[in-house]
Amino acid sequence: MILITLEHILTQIYFSFILVITLVFGGTLVYPVNKLSNSVKKGIIFPFFCITLNLIIRWFYSRHLPLSNLYESLMFFSWNFCLIPFFIDIKNPNTQWIGVITAPSALFTHAFATLILPIEMQQSQRLIPALQSHWLIMHVTIIFLGYVTLLCGSLSSIALLAINLEKKLSFFTLYFRKEYSYENKRKAFHPYSFKNFRKSQMIHQIDNLSYYTIVIGFTFLTIGILSGAVWANEAWGSYWSWDPKEIWALITWLIFANYIHIRLNKGWEGNKPALVASLGLFFVWICYFGVNILGIGFHSYGWFL
């Protein structure tokens, strides 16, 4: 009872802090302040500690990795969204955009798990015999890291497309406004103006962030699929059974393999590969969440209504 109470307290603390961090990150988009952004990036350490302790407590009293139902998988998903920025900061320590993407994602998944799912689905359940294996920790952890990192890369690509679209709309709007003189238009569209230079820098940064996160996520997804195949062979005597989750995982893998191919071999950057990565967002969510809603297959957590 004490552990369950502590778990609920940590859940509320985590939600409160991640909500504040999300709002602050949103504010830095409108009013960029580097010192504030850096402080918020460091501030995510505390909610990450809270949700980590939350999962450890649930692991302790349930006697297994907390992934027995949809609620626990969503909480684990939220934990992964808090973990990803630490990976990205190793390669790109000055990247502000990753927090803008991961904080709302962590908030959304946590809010859905705690506020939308019924109470009975939030209770810990016993693992079925096939899942009582050491492979559970490796396979599920790796595959979830793959899902979350790919989602971050896809969301970065959507942000890139949105910024480029806004840039084009601003161009046409300003160009056809009669009250603007030729000199003002020339300054506004000059590629070396401070505003355009800053926006171009941002686009380049987001493009690189998207590529970097997708490469990491693709690696995790590949390892996760391979480890899952080995586990399936041990549990059911077959490496591949065309389970709905397996099919959608393969489709997702092919989508992002195509993205990496056109980036590396064709040298495409900007909108074209971003469109492919944006499409991947749909397939990742179907692979994870859609199969669970259907409530079919070995990997389903069941219908939640």
From Swiss-Prot:
Entry keyword Coiled coil: no
Assigned protein family: Belongs to the CcmF/CycK/Ccl1/NrfE/CcsA family.
InterPro entries linked to this entry: Cyt_c_assembly (IPR002541), Cyt_c_biogenesis_CcsA (IPR017562), Cyt_c_biogenesis_CcsA/CcmC (IPR045062)
GO cellular component term of the entry, any: chloroplast thylakoid membrane
Keyword Plastid: yes
Gene Ontology MF terms: heme binding
Primary residence: plastid
Name used for this protein in its record: Cytochrome c biogenesis protein CcsA
Function, as annotated: Required during biogenesis of c-type cytochromes (cytochrome c6 and cytochrome f) at the step of heme attachment.
UniProt keywords, alphabetically: Chloroplast, Cytochrome c-type biogenesis, Membrane, Plastid, Thylakoid, Transmembrane, Transmembrane helix
Subunit structure: May interact with Ccs1.
UniProt topology in membrane: Multi-pass membrane protein
Organism: Welwitschia mirabilis
Compartments where located: Plastid, Chloroplast thylakoid membrane
Gene Ontology biological process terms, A to Z: cytochrome complex assembly
Signal peptide: none
Transmembrane spans: 13-33, 42-62, 70-90, 97-117, 135-155, 212-232, 242-262, 276-296
Gene, per the UniProt record: ccsA
